[in-house]
């Protein structure tokens, strides 16, 4: 693909041969005890959050975690052998009609505030993704009724619970997994694709879905 081709700047993370994964200047080994909400703040702001900052992120996610019923109907209507990645991408696109960025752009939004609408969309989508991913798992693999989100829990514990596992050790494993996969630098297929699609002023629902299409490839 683009191996060795310099095509964009990424300041959120990098992998160094002698140091491993570095996220915002911090070695990943020093972040393994952090919650997803803390990692999100770190990626956005560039520094670790205070307790009040973490609580603010949790409240923001909780306020936008509800997933409309039509999305679950769409997932249930997909073929029984649909690939889970296809279902996740379809679920994200089923939310595109809620895009703040798209609405404000159509209303004549000024260029210098594009980032505000894009951030708002991103937060809303990220808040819903655990419930969408859990629904994909439970529908695709016939695990029974969907388990409603509990906005009072942190993201990793809530996701583990919606998958159907209440074991605290599993929730801790999910938290660690989310931390290790929090950022993909900028030059891999999925992240780069998201950048390219967003550069056409497509909203985050489109750009994230496009990135996942790249991630679904075998390479």
Where are these regions (language model features)?
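Hydrophobic alpha-helical bundle cores within soluble ligand-binding/oligomerization subdomains
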Residues: 1-219
């Amino acid at each position: 693909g683009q191996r060795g081709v310099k095509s964009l700047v990424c300041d959120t993370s990098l992998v160094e041969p002698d140091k491993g994964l570095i996220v915002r200047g911090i070695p990943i080994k020093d972040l393994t005890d952090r919650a997803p909400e803390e990692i999100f703040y770190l990626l956005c702001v560039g520094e670790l959050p205070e307790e009040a900052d973490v609580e603010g992120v949790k409240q923001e996610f909780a306020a936008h975690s509800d997933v409309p019923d039509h999305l679950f109907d769409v997932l249930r209507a997909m073929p029984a052998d649909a690939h889970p990645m296809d279902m996740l991408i379809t679920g994200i696109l089923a939310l595109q009609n809620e895009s703040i960025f798209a609405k404000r752009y159509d209303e004549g939004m000024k260029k210098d505030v594009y980032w505000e609408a894009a951030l708002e969309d991103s937060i809303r989508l990220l808040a819903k993704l655990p419930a969408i991913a859990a629904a994909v798992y439970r529908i695709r693999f016939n695990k029974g009724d969907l388990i409603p989100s509990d906005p009072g829990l942190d993201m990793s514990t809530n996701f583990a619970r919606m998958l159907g596992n209440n074991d605290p050790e599993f929730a801790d494993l999910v938290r660690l997994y989310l931390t290790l996969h929090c950022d993909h630098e900028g030059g891999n297929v999925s992240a780069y694709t998201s950048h390219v699609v967003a550069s056409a002023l497509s909203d985050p629902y489109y750009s994230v879905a496009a990135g996942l299409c790249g991630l679904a490839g075998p390479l």
